[in-house]
Amino acid sequence: MVTSAHRTPAGFAPPSSAGDRSAEVWSALGTVTDPEIDESVTSLEFITSVQIEPGNAVRIEFRLPTYWCAPNFAFLMASDMRDAIAELSWVEKVTVELLDHFSADLINRGVAARQDFRDAFPGETDDDLSAIRKKFLEKAFERRQELLVRYLLRSGYDASWISRASSRELARTQLTDEGIALRRLYVFIWRRIFAGLGEENLAFTTVAGAPLEASELPGYLRKVALVRRNAEFNGAICRGLLAARNSRLAA
């Protein structure tokens, strides 16, 4: 029997009341992204149900834009949802269920058993999800970096300052609400890419760690802008497909 449940149909905002466990779960889910387009599964409206069950258990159901979405991406998102919710101090059990997908059974069983993707699909794939995750993490880094750097340039910070600013200086810089949000997203992924580096290190480098020279910044931004535009294009397609699918299911 479910003692506390919150179901949110596609198109409705998740709960946000302070202290509500459902809101905590939604907040945790908001940190999980579609790896291909670097947008959260909540903003993309993939989540169809969040349930708080007896014994501090959480059950998540989600649906992707098509029945044929790539199973490796679906597996990544499902396992990331599981891990994000499991980090909540009161959660003792997490169940994540992918709905209406051709590989849903294999994905759901594999995520529940904490299997590697190749173990969940024995004999069917050689995909190394760690390599796939790294590839899309690097693309997300470039996308978030470009957005923050362009914001800083619009706000009066010149290319010279950007090329030499340390992470400490970036953290102390006074920004608008927009800038604070962009900085938070960038710093989060910077710490994942450059784990072990400190606040004295350069805030803005290439994904390989090479310094960005002020004179090279315009060309660099043009190059990484292609990553963002591709992600935004894929995101628009994704939303359209999901909206069409939800309309068919609701009919």
Predicted segments, located by residue:
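Domain-level signature for proteins that mediate thiol-based redox and metal-cofactor handling
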Residues: 1-67, 72-251
